[in-house]
Curated annotation (Swiss-Prot):
PROSITE patterns: HTH_TETR_1, HTH_TETR_2. GO terms for molecular function: DNA binding. Residues 29-48 bind DNA. This is HTH-type transcriptional regulator SAS2464. Residues 6-66 form the HTH tetR-type domain. It comes from the Bacteria. The keyword Transcription applies.
Length: 185
């Protein structure tokens, strides 16, 4: 990418991040970002496919930091129960802190893109390793189902409409996804 194109892209990300922080992700359109920057929509869409794509890049630095700390959990805790409990606490807090950006990313036109993202793959690998069994198909299924239950929309629905506390949500997931032996370790 040319230097001026890189600078343009970085400027777009910075202004989008500022506007998202000030007015909320849901209140800012791609058109508003382009007007704020004094650029055409074509320039904006040359860098980002849609708002979901832009949100992914805006949060990318935070995702990288999150993944670094997330991976450390396996080194700091030894039982599957502890690893799962601490990782869920960390992930759920991250979802609370970044709810609007994550909802935008997950609600994008190309939902498959989120499931193919490095972030999703890191989460998948982390929990797949935790659930690993002789039945690879089952382990993949179990991991995908956990991650689906951790989607921002499912989490928000349970907290906001079912009025489940975050701690209860975490504990329910522990009960569903860890067998009794692992829970009592």
């Amino acid at each position: 990418m040319r230097k001026d194109a890189k600078e343009n892209r970085q400027r777009i990300e910075e202004i989008a991040h500022k506007l998202f922080d000030e007015e909320g992700v849901e209140n800012i359109s791609m058109n508003r970002i382009a007007k704020e920057l004094g650029i055409g929509m074509g320039t904006l869409y040359r860098h980002f496919k849609d708002k979901s794509d832009l949100c992914y890049y805006v949060i990318q630095r935070d995702l990288d930091i999150f993944i670094t700390h997330f991976k450390q959990i396996k080194d700091d805790y030894h039982s599957n129960y502890e690893v799962m409990q601490v990782s869920l606490d960390y992930l759920l807090q991250f979802k609370i802190d970044n709810k609007a950006l994550l909802q935008c990313i997950e609600a994008g036109n190309n939902k498959l893109r989120f499931y193919q993202s490095a972030f999703y793959q890191e989460l998948f690998d982390f929990y797949y390793d935790l659930f690993k069994s002789d039945d690879d198909t089952y382990t993949k299924f179990k991991t995908d189902m956990l991650l689906q239950s951790l989607s921002t929309s499912v989490f928000a629905f349970q907290i906001e409409h079912r009025h489940i506390s975050i701690e209860a949500y975490r504990n329910y997931l522990l009960n569903i996804y860890l067998d009794e032996v692992e829970r009592n370790d």
